[in-house]
């Protein structure tokens, strides 16, 4: 085969890709759970996120733009520090789009726990962008916004 001949087109299994993307999104959300194993769950983000990934918080505030480490560090302190207990995040509903080696999950999520003795809860939307790597699907970017006065999710 000459260097100019193309190899056979790859076969994409969209159902398997959707399942793998869903697994990555679930692992991302599951990382935000308080308790003794929270450092291990958060550490998994270091392989789930590309090293150059960007994470952006909007929430009606000045943008919070984080690289991987600046995103993980304060969450490690909060989730393992004891002031936030019984905390977890989970998806409510979402849509997965896949095309070749790129994918996106856009969906609603919820969170709840007890912070400094007071119940806390919220909902919002997350946009998760993923790319296929030799190691599997990895997150390249995340952005989120939470409900607040004037901005609410429909019943999920």
Regions found by a protein language model. Give the residues of each.
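A solvent-exposed, acidic/Ser-Thr-rich amphipathic alpha-helical stretch
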Residues: 42-99
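Short, cysteine-centered beta-strand-loop-beta hairpins and adjacent loop/turn segments enriched
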Residues: 81-84, 111-121
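Short, low-complexity N-terminal intrinsically disordered segments enriched in polar/charged residues
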Residues: 1-48
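Hydrophobic/aromatic beta-strand elements that line small-molecule binding cavities or substrate pockets
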Residues: 91-96, 109-111, 125-131
């Amino acid at each position: 085969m000459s260097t100019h001949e193309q190899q056979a087109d790859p076969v994409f299994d969209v159902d398997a890709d959707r399942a793998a993307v869903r697994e990555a999104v679930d692992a991302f959300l599951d990382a935000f759970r308080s308790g003794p194993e929270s450092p291990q769950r958060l550490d998994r983000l270091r392989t789930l996120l590309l090293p150059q990934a960007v994470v952006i918080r909007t929430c009606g505030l000045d943008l919070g733009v984080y690289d991987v480490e600046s995103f993980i560090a304060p969450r490690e302190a909060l989730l393992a520090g004891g002031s936030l207990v019984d905390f977890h995040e989970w998806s409510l509903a979402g849509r997965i789009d896949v095309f070749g080696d790129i994918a996106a999950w856009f969906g609603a999520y919820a969170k709840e726990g007890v912070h400094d003795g007071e119940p806390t809860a919220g909902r919002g939307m997350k946009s998760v962008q993923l790319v296929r790597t030799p190691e599997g699907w990895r997150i390249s970017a995340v952005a989120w916004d939470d409900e607040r006065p004037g901005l609410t999710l429909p019943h999920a």
